[in-house]
């Protein structure tokens, strides 16, 4: 049904200038959730963005605005009056307003802040003081706070009076007179409480999982995965409650981190823009530097081949198997690296696990290498008709290459973590470049020994 509504909306927009059926357009928009409406906005020309946005129901407009990409948000802001912009800013959650300010150019930021009310402006400025990738940078200050001496009835009344403007009321956070976090109580517990005169201190859970304002956002997202929370409280150095991180922010963090890791693992500069929103120049800048670096790194393989030209000249058939060996080594190393990076990303693997990693990877590598070597040996003798010594050289190299590649693939991400470098950088392209050179060294030295070159 949603797809039908979207298509109907797009058809009406195409003929809007002629039809002027604004009420019909509004009726269709009211049937669509904010993410679907935002997808329609992304495809509109800049001059139609304000027209459609003004038709959004008031309670939906802020949600649609939040779902838009920064580029589309800026185009829309440029088409809104100051009064309309103020209405949008007033409806945004503080963390979303802070994200907006961080993404916009200075002239747009100045206009946004000038339209925000003093309280919102103060909270935005407070959040901007925290590092962007920290819990403080992604938290919201709009939370439901209770006191331990409140009764259930008083707490429910406080939620009814103040809960409308909060990010979430599923969990209410209990603080003492100094705003120090002492417990958490769920709305579920309050609703089901049999005695409305019971104090909150008797219902609250005092074993609260919290993070500090400086906790890395990726670590925060892992807590959501581990405990299944909908929100996590954020405290300062003195355990005073300053905000919460909600599940929607955690999902955004995981998506951003995954996108960044995938880009780095494929030697592409990360970008927060959708593919079709990136210009040719953006794509060029994200790829060319890495390609240049990898091309220069690959010259080591050329130097190795040049150093063993005599061996290749003596047994030219060896040249035919270089691509197979380097590809096998690169693939094995990439498999190992991807597995280790994934384990580190979800907290399963720590740097001190390196000895266990090497032990496991070496055994797996020997099994994989032996399997490939046996199959390859038969293929070389039966189909390629090479001599047994040449087949032995290729297969011994294959086993050694698989072993070395998987060990390198296991070591580099852990080393990167110890050096405080993103492990994703030590991924497929870089591993392949390193393994190519080492594979050739192994190949030619095995050939010299076995073939007496």
Language-model regions, residue ranges each:
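Hydrophobic packing positions in regular secondary-structure scaffolds
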Residues: 1-269
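Alpha-helical transmembrane segments in multi-pass membrane proteins
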Residues: 34, 290-298, 321, 325, ...
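Non-transmembrane, extramembrane segments of multi-pass ion/lipid transporters
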Residues: 122, 249-283, 334-357, 414-420
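Soluble-to-membrane junctions at the N-terminal ends of transmembrane alpha-helices
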Residues: 274-293, 351-370, 391-394
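Juxtamembrane "helix exit" motif at the C-terminal ends of alpha-helical transmembrane segments
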Residues: 295-312, 375-386
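Hydrophobic, small-residue-rich transmembrane alpha-helices and their short perimembrane loops
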Residues: 304, 317-336
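Membrane-water interface of transmembrane alpha-helices in multipass transporters/channels
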Residues: 307-321, 384-396
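Interfacial loop-to-transmembrane junctions
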Residues: 415-435
């Amino acid at each position: 049904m949603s797809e039908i509504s979207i298509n109907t909306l797009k058809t009406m927009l195409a003929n809007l200038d002629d039809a002027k059926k604004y009420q019909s357009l509004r009726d269709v928009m009211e049937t669509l959730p904010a993410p679907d409406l935002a997808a329609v906005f992304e495809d509109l020309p800049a001059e139609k963005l304000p027209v459609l946005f003004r038709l959004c129901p008031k309670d939906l407009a802020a949600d649609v605005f939040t779902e838009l990409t920064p580029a589309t948000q800026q185009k829309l802001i440029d088409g809104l009056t100051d009064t309309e912009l103020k209405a949008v800013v007033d409806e945004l959650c503080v963390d979303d307003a802070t994200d907006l300010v961080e993404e916009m150019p200075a002239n747009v930021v100045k206009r946004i802040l000038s339209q925000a009310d003093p309280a919102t402006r103060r909270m935005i400025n407070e959040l901007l003081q925290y590092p962007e990738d920290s819990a403080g940078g992604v938290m919201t200050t709009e939370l439901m706070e209770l006191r331990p001496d409140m009764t259930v009835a008083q707490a429910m009344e406080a939620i009814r009076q103040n809960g409308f403007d909060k990010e979430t009321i599923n969990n209410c956070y209990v603080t003492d007179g100094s705003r120090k976090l002492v417990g958490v109580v769920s709305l579920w517990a309050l609703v089901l409480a049999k005695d409305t005169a019971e104090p909150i201190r008797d219902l609250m859970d005092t074993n609260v999982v919290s993070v500090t304002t400086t906790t890395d956002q990726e670590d925060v997202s892992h807590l959501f995965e581990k405990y299944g929370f909908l929100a996590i409280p954020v405290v300062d150095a003195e355990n005073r409650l300053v905000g919460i991180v909600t599940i929607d922010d955690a999902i955004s963090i995981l998506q951003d981190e995954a996108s960044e890791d995938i880009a780095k693992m494929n030697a592409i500069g990360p970008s927060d823009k959708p593919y079709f929103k990136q210009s040719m120049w953006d794509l060029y800048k994200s790829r060319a530097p890495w390609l240049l670096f990898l091309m220069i790194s690959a010259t080591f393989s050329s130097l190795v081949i040049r150093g063993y030209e005599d061996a290749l000249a003596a047994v030219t058939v060896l040249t035919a198997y270089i691509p197979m060996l380097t590809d096998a080594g690169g693939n094995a190393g990439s498999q190992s690296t991807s597995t280790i990076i994934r384990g580190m990303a979800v907290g399963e693997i720590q740097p001190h696990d390196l000895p266990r990693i090497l032990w496991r990877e070496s055994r797996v590598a020997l099994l994989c290498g032996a399997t490939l070597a046996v199959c390859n040996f038969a293929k070389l003798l039966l189909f390629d008709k090479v001599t047994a010594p040449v087949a032995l050289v290729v297969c011994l190299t294959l086993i050694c290459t698989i072993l070395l590649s998987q060990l390198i693939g296991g070591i580099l991400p852990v080393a990167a973590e110890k050096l405080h470098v993103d492990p994703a950088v030590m991924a497929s392209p870089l591993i392949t470049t390193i393994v190519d050179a080492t594979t050739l060294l192994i190949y030619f030295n095995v050939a010299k020994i076995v073939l007496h070159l």
